[in-house]
Amino acid sequence: MAKDNRKLIVVGVDGSELSLVALRTARRLADLLHCRVEAMTVWTHPISLAAPVASAEWSPRVDAEEALNEAVLQAFGDDVPEGLTKIAVSGQPVQVLVEASKDAEMLVVGSRGRGGFAGLLLGSVSSAAAAHAHCPVLIVHPSETE
């Protein structure tokens, strides 16, 4: 399989409605700019005071990959963009997205994710990513048309 040398648009995906809008927006931009899309989700090891769960029973990485697959399915159905890659990375969302931005033409994120306060105009991850990314950042806000 030949390597895809098109420039990259990275999309932060957390399964929220705005991250689905971010995926769709990135696709439209990728089509216009002849780029490829990388859908990225970030997971962390849970902090627990209880005994660790055996990895054969539960894996946060597998959960993250399944959630990412579901988000891509919800965003595109059977019409997944050609060359779209999906990646689930362990770490802190801001750090992972900023690192990914080093190789990207653009980073696309929703204005708010699953956490935090619904009334805020801009979430902590999108705000920090915009402040520290190594490429332009597009922050997708809710609209009545989506």
Regions found by a protein language model. Give the residues of each.
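Small/aliphatic-rich secondary-structure junction motif
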Residues: 2-53
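Short, hinge-like loop/turn segments at secondary-structure boundaries
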Residues: 54-58, 104-105
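A short acidic, glycine-rich active-site loop
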Residues: 56-67
